[in-house]
Curated annotation (Swiss-Prot):
GO biological process: 'de novo' cotranslational protein folding; cell division; chaperone-mediated protein folding; protein transport; protein unfolding
Gene3D superfamilies assigned to the protein according to its UniProt record, in alphabetical order: 3.10.50.40, Trigger factor ribosome-binding domain, Trigger factor, C-terminal domain
Database matches in SUPFAM superfamilies: FKBP-like, Triger factor/SurA peptide-binding domain-like, Trigger factor ribosome-binding domain
GO cellular component, one term: cytoplasm
Lineage, broadest ranks: Bacteria, Bacillati, Bacillota, Clostridia, Eubacteriales
Compartment(s): Cytoplasm
Protein name: Trigger factor
KW Isomerase (keyword) present: yes
Residue span(s) of domain PPIase FKBP-type: 163-248
Source organism (scientific name): Clostridium kluyveri (strain ATCC 8527 / DSM 555 / NBRC 12016 / NCIMB 10680 / K1)
Protein family: Belongs to the FKBP-type PPIase family. Tig subfamily.
Length: 430
């Protein structure tokens, strides 16, 4: 096999690969073996006609497509290895010469991983955000706990007041016509929560159970659905029931009921500690991101478009998976966010470019610094993940993870080591 390499443009090369006639003939035999049973030739049992007879009936090129495929599959990887080509995507194959008894010549045009020109990556100067726990944060958490522990009871007498929960049936109309998503039954609406369109909840105040009313509202200009943006709407509402929340008092009895503590002061201290820990994790995460961003800004890379698009594809698939867990699909998401695939892909591009660049930078630093993951470290990582799954048989689960995700775990460990090195060497500035 002979290979000539030509640089077409930055990050794109073309390989001209010449395969010996004997090797191509072997591929022809494989193609014949794969397809022989499909042919029904007069004078022969089906699938028993020899190659030369089949070619006589169907033409010399009858097996070329499969033979070409077999030949490329067996020679293209060797051509890449021989020329130290690291492809990003599948190649564009074009046949130059093909024929039995002749050399098989084809070209493979392929996008390759870009050159990464690292700048300063040790000792980068970065600001570190800090977050304090405020008293209002603790008070808000206590209010949330009160709401969760509140008792909901039917309001036997009286009309709807702010803070009450109205059980309603409603049907919405725009321009006199019903619209999708504008109808509900037995909907629990907390008055004052701001759940519905502006001025909807306020118009229910004073109604009694059994009352009906037409509520007039206007959708916001940027509501997110073209047919409703800025439109006047009328909702026919029937109040079926009114409920009240009985909010518990904030005292030691409340503390005992909602926690493992005996006093309200202990609950407050626990909230403070948990929020401080959460803030610390946030500070560390944001600092890591800032360090990596600084290192990336010092690095020159001309990222191939195909890498950005592939990452966007991954992001779309992740979005689709998350939506499925919520019982939604992409089309529904696009509709209710007033988007389409093109808009979403464009929105994701910036994040995609940053991620691709960050991955390339970390990989290059790992190569320069000779950062590796040992087999023992990979096993420990698999065990750590197995424990997080809460498996009854951690050892068995770790083996399953190791067998299926060894390369991913290896990459994860290397990335963590590189990030630790970058963070440890960085300098915090005011």
């Amino acid at each position: 096999m002979n290979v000539k390499m030509e640089k077409i443009e930055e990050n794109v090369v073309k390989l001209e690969i010449t395969v010996e006639a004997d090797k191509f003939n072997e591929s022809m035999k494989k193609a014949f073996a794969k397809n022989a049973k499909k042919f029904n030739i007069p004078g022969f049992r089906k699938g028993k006609a020899p190659m030369n007879i089949i070619k006589k009936y169907y033409g010399e090129g009858v097996f070329y497509e499969d033979a070409m495929s077999f030949c490329c599959e067996s020679t293209y990887p060797d051509a890449l290895k021989e020329n130290n080509v690291n492809p990003v995507d599948y190649p564009k194959i074009e046949v130059v010469q093909i024929g039995e008894g002749k050399e098989f010549i084809y070209t493979a045009e392929v996008t390759v991983f870009p050159e990464v020109k690292l700048g300063e990556y040790k000792g980068v100067e970065v600001k570190k955000n800090t977050y304090d726990v405020k008293e209002e944060d603790i008070e808000q958490e206590l209010k949330n706990m009160q709401q969760k522990d509140a008792r909901i009871e039917t309001k036997e007498n009286g009309s709807i007041e702010n803070g009450n929960i109205a059980i309603i049936d409603f049907k919405g109309f725009v321009d006199g016509k019903e619209f999708e998503g504008g109808e509900g039954q037995d909907y629990q609406l907390e008055i004052g929560s701001g759940t519905f369109i502006d001025n909807f909840e306020e118009q229910l105040i004073g109604l009694n159970a059994g009352d009906s009313k037409e509520v007039n509202v206007k959708f916001p200009e940027e509501y997110g659905i073209d047919d409703l943006n800025g439109k006047e709407a009328v909702f026919k509402v029937t109040v079926k029931e009114i409920k009240v929340k009985e909010i518990p008092e904030l005292d030691d009895e409340f503390a005992k009921e909602v926690s493992e503590f005996d006093t309200l002061d202990e609950v407050k201290e626990d909230i403070r500690n948990k929020k401080q820990e959460a803030n610390k994790l946030r500070e560390e995460r944001e600092f890591e991101e800032a360090v990596l961003e600084a290192v990336c800004s010092n690095t020159e890379i001309n990222i191939p478009e195909v890498m950005v698009e592939k990452e966007v594809d991954n992001m779309i698939r992740d979005l689709e998976t998350r939506l499925k867990y919520q019982g939604l699909d992409l089309e529904t998401y696009y509709k209710y966010t007033n988007n389409d695939e093109q808009k979403v892909r464009e929105y994701m591009r910036e994040t995609s470019e940053k991620k691709v660049k960050a991955d390339l930078v970390i990989t290059e630093i790992a190569k320069v610094e000779k950062v590796e993951a040992s087999d023992e470290e990979i096993k420990e990582k698999a065990t750590e993940i197995a424990k997080q799954y809460g498996s009854d048989d951690v050892e068995k689960m770790a083996k399953i993870i190791l067998d299926g995700q060894k390369e991913y775990l290896k990459m994860q460990i290397v990335n963590e080591k590189v990030m630790k090195m970058l963070v440890d060497s960085s300098k915090i500035i005011a």
